C-alpha cells in the first residue's frame, strides 16, 4: 500500500509543516500552481506507521547481514552522520562566500590530504559524485594527457574480462575502443595475452586490485611495466580498496590514476541509489588535468581553485563540489579510526572473507579459485548443484531471504557460471558469519532433497518471487493520481 492509498480528505500533519513558509512574492504568475498538488492527506500517526512498517519489511545494514559482493555493505557509524549534520556544515550554501565556509573547506582539504597518503597519489580531487563518474573522470584525464602530447593514435583502453561493467562503458564514453584481456586459470590477468595487446594504440589499462574475482593480482608490477613501456597509463578502480587499506597503496603498485568509492571503503551510507562520492587521485603527470573545484591553502585559510589556476583541467563534473555531505562523513570516519584503525579494516575484512570461504567449502560448496586465498570477498559457484538438482544461483539467493540474510551478488563476474559473490566486510562478528554458514548449509541440503522449494523461494517475505521479465518490460515506477470522475 502506498502513502497515497491512506489519504483521506481533510486530514493533516501540521506538526511537520515547514516553520517558515516560502516567500513566493516576485515569482512570475505563470510559474505558480493554480491548483494544489496531489499530495496525500494523512495524519502524523499515519505517516509514522506507514514508513515504520515499510522499514520493517526491508533489509538494511542496520538490521541484517548484507553480504553483497563488490559493494562493501559495512556498518555506517552514526557518529559520522551526527557530525555531518551539524548546522555549520548542513546550512552552508554552495554559492556562499569562502569566508563563511572555512570550516567545511578545512575538512575537505584535510580529506584530500588523507586520501593522498592512503593511496600514494600526488593530488586528489573530491568533485566526482559517484564511482562511475570517477571512472569517467579518470579516463577523461588519460585522454587529456595523450591529447596534450599530440599522441592521438592511442585509441584503445585495455579492460580485463572480469572488470566491472562500468569500466568499458567509461572508456567508450571517452571515445576509446575497448580491448578485452582474458583471465587465466588462477584468476589473474593473462600476461601473455596482455603482451600481445599492448602497443602504440594503447592509451591505458583499467584494473581493480584485488580483482572482481576476489583475488589479489599477483603480477601487478609486470603489468605496470608492460603498459608503461608501451606508453600507456594505469587506471585503478578503487571498488575493492577495502581489502588493502593501509597495507599497500595503488600509487606504489604503479597506477597513474585512481578513483575511490567513499560510499564503500569509507563507510558512508549507500544502497538506495545515492548519494555517493568517487574522488580521483593522480600522480604528477596527470595533476594538471584534475577536475575542479579543488580546495587549496591560501595564507591562513582555504580557497577554491578556479579554472584560471588549472588551465589544463578537464573542467567540472558538476557545478559545485560533489556531494559534500558524503565527503564529510568519510572525513569523520577516517578521523574516528586513524591510520592504525584503517589498517585493521583491511585485516578484519580479509579475515572474515577467508573464514567464511573456508567454512562454506567445508559445508560442500565450490569456490571459483580453490587454490587462492580470498581478498575481502570470494566467489562460490553452484554450477554442480544446477547440473545435479536443477537449482540455480538465483534460487540460493532468493531462499537466503527466508533465513533473514540479504542475498549476495549473483551472476557477476560473468565468466564464472552460476556464481554468488560474497563480501562479509570487517564489521560482522563470528556469530553472524556462523549463522550465515548454517543457513547456506541448510539451503544446500534443501537443494538435494526439495529443489522445488528453492525454485519457488522466497516464502516468508512480504513480496514473493516476482516475474522479473514482466517487471523489466512493463515497469510501474510512479504513482499517478486517478482520473477525476466525470459528472453525471
From Swiss-Prot:
EC number: 1.4.4.2
Biological processes per GO annotation: glycine decarboxylation via glycine cleavage system
Signal peptide, first to last residue: none
Cofactor: pyridoxal 5'-phosphate
Gene Ontology, cellular component aspect: cytosol; glycine cleavage complex
Intrachain disulfide bonds: none
Catalytic activity, reaction form: N(6)-[(R)-lipoyl]-L-lysyl-[glycine-cleavage complex H protein] + glycine + H(+) = N(6)-[(R)-S(8)-aminomethyldihydrolipoyl]-L-lysyl-[glycine-cleavage complex H protein] + CO2
Modified residues (N6-(pyridoxal phosphate)lysine): 264
Reported function: The glycine cleavage system catalyzes the degradation of glycine. The P protein binds the alpha-amino group of glycine through its pyridoxal phosphate cofactor; CO(2) is released and the remaining methylamine moiety is then transferred to the lipoamide cofactor of the H protein.
Subunit structure: The glycine cleavage system is composed of four proteins: P, T, L and H. In this organism, the P 'protein' is a heterodimer of two subunits.
Family: Belongs to the GcvP family. C-terminal subunit subfamily.
Record protein name field: Probable glycine dehydrogenase (decarboxylating) subunit 2
Organism this protein belongs to: Methylococcus capsulatus (strain ATCC 33009 / NCIMB 11132 / Bath)
Gene: gcvPB
Amino acid at each position: 500500500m502506498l502513502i497515497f492509498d491512506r489519504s483521506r480528505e481533510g486530514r493533516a500533519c501540521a506538526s511537520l509543516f515547514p516553520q517558515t513558509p516560502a516567500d513566493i512574492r516576485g515569482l512570475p504568475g505563470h510559474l505558480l500552481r493554480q491548483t494544489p498538488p496531489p499530495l496525500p492527506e494523512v495524519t502524523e500517526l499515519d505517516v509514522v506507521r506507514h514508513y515504520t512498517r515499510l522499514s520493517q519489511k526491508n533489509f538494511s545494514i542496520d538490521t541484517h547481514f548484507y553480504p553483497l559482493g563488490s559493494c562493501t555493505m559495512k556498518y555506517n557509524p552514526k557518529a559520522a552522520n551526527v557530525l555531518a549534520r551539524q548546522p555549520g556544515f548542513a546550512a552552508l550554501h554552495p554559492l556562499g562566500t569562502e569566508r563563511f565556509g572555512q570550516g567545511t573547506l578545512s575538512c575537505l582539504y584535510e580529506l584530500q590530504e588523507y586520501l593522498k597518503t592512503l593511496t600514494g597519489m600526488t593530488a586528489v580531487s573530491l568533485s566526482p559524485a559517484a564511482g562511475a563518474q570517477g571512472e569517467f573522470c579518470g579516463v577523461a584525464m588519460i585522454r587529456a594527457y595523450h591529447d596534450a602530447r599530440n599522441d592521438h593514435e592511442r585509441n584503445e583502453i585495455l579492460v580485463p574480462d572480469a572488470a566491472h561493467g562500468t569500466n568499458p562503458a567509461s572508456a567508450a564514453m571517452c571515445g576509446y575502443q575497448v580491448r578485452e584481456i582474458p583471465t587465466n586459470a588462477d584468476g589473474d590477468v593473462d600476461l601473455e595475452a596482455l603482451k600481445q595487446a599492448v602497443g602504440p594504440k594503447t592509451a591505458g589499462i583499467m584494473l581493480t586490485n584485488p580483482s572482481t574475482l576476489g583475488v589479489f593480482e599477483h603480477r601487478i608490477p609486470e603489468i605496470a611495466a608492460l603498459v608503461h613501456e608501451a606508453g600507456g597509463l594505469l587506471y585503478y578502480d578503487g571498488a575493492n580498496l577495502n581489502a588493502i587499506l593501509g597495507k599497500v597503496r595503488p600509487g606504489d603498485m604503479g597506477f597513474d590514476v585512481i578513483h575511490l568509492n567513499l560510499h564503500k571503503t569509507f563507510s558512508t551510507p549507500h544502497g538506495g541509489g545515492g548519494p555517493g562520492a568517487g574522488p580521483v587521485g593522480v600522480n604528477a603527470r596527470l595533476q594538471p588535468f584534475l577536475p575542479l573545484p579543488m580546495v587549496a591553502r591560501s595564507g591562513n585559510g582555504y580557497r577554491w581553485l578556479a579554472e584560471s589556476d588549472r588551465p589544463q583541467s578537464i573542467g567540472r563534473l558538476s557545478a559545485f563540489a560533489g556531494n559534500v555531505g558524503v565527503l564529510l562523513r568519510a572525513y569523520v570516519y577516517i578521523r574516528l579510526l586513524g591510520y592504525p584503525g584503517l589498517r585493521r579494516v583491511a585485516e578484519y575484512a580479509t579475515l572474515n572473507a577467508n573464514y567464511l570461504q573456508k567454512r562454506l567449502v567445508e559445508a560442500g560448496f565450490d569456490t571459483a579459485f580453490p587454490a587462492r586465498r580470498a581478498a575481502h570477498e570470494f566467489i562460490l559457484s553452484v554450477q554442480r548443484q544446477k547440473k545435479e538438482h536443477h537449482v540455480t544461483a538465483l534460487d540460493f539467493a532468493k531462499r537466503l531471504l527466508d533465513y533473514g540474510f540479504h542475498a549476495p551478488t549473483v551472476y557477476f563476474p560473468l565468466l564464472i557460471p552460476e556464481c554468488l559473490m560474497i563480501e562479509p566486510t570487517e564489521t560482522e562478528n563470528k556469530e553472524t558469519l556462523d549463522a550465515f554458514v548454517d543457513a547456506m548449509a541448510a539451503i544446500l541440503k534443501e537443494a538435494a532433497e526439495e529443489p522445488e522449494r528453492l525454485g519457488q523461494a522466497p516464502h516468508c517475505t512480504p513480496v514473493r518471487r516476482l516475474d522479473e521479465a514482466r517487471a523489466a518490460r512493463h515497469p510501474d515506477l510512479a504513482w499517478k493520481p486517478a482520473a477525476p470522475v466525470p459528472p453525471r
